[in-house]
Amino acid sequence: MMKHVKGMDGVFIMRDSLVTVNLTPGVRVYGEKLIEWGGSEYRVWDPRRSKMAAAVLNGLRGFQLNPESRVLYLGASAGTTASHISDIVTMGRVYCVEFSPRMMRELIEVCRVRGNMVPLLEDASRPLDYMRMVENADLVYCDVAQPDQTGLFIRNMDCFLKDDGYGLIMVKARSIDVTRSPRKIFREEAGKLRDSGFRIIDQVGLKPYEKDHMAILVQRSV
């Protein structure tokens, strides 16, 4: 039994697992399971390796990704989640911003076989540095474990997000302040987004896959 995930082309729930249609059949990115079904190959999207997968499995809805979407990914690391987004936006682009040279080396290897992924060795807190290399985005996705993660997310949305686009941030409370209640931190970060002209579309916690994380989906206020 296969169920399509609303709003996300090529994403399904199969046998209680989240899967994407493999853009590069036969090729794994992080040792994920491959499933052949109905003449297509699917990659299991592991929610313990991908916060976006965890958010979707926990019920996050309200944004659209289609084959022509352009995505700006802040904190792409070695490309685990970005590769699944690449499966979805087959004719679009995934601009992968990563600051760590070590992670970038691994990310480049993923990008070599996925022509719609663009690796950028840049600091996500300085969007003007890569402004000429990135097109306007349908989705700005942020998974950066820094105290100012919401601030840099907002700056990137101000630079790159289309008027009708979406922003999705994985707020890590312990990276902001280990001494305070995660619930209070999540409320404050959501407030920063509202104060900057964005409305909250949806938000979900990431338990049991991640502790003290909250996925917050936003869009520009009308």
UniProtKB/Swiss-Prot annotation:
UniProt: S-adenosyl-L-methionine binding residues: 80-81, 98-99, 123-124, 143-146
GO biological process annotation, one example: tRNA processing
InterPro entries: Fibrillarin, Fibrillarin_CS, SAM-dependent_MTases_sf
Molecular-function GO term, any one: histone H2AQ104 methyltransferase activity
Known EC number: 2.1.1.-
Keywords: Methyltransferase, RNA-binding, rRNA processing, Transferase, tRNA processing
Disulfide bonds: none
Domain of life of the source: Viruses
Coiled-coil regions, chain positions: none
Class of the enzyme per the UniProt entry, highest EC level: transferase
PANTHER family cross-referenced by the UniProt entry: FIBRILLARIN, RRNA 2-O-METHYLTRANSFERASE FIBRILLARIN
Record function comment: Involved in pre-rRNA and tRNA processing. Utilizes the methyl donor S-adenosyl-L-methionine to catalyze the site-specific 2'-hydroxyl methylation of ribose moieties in rRNA and tRNA. Site specificity is provided by a guide RNA that base pairs with the substrate. Methylation occurs at a characteristic distance from the sequence involved in base pairing with the guide RNA.
Description of how the protein assembles with itself and partners: Interacts with nop5. Component of box C/D small ribonucleoprotein (sRNP) particles that contain rpl7ae, FlpA and nop5, plus a guide RNA.
Family stated for the protein in its record: Belongs to the methyltransferase superfamily. Fibrillarin family.
Name of the featured protein: Fibrillarin-like rRNA/tRNA 2'-O-methyltransferase
Organism expressing this protein natively: Methanothermobacter phage psiM100
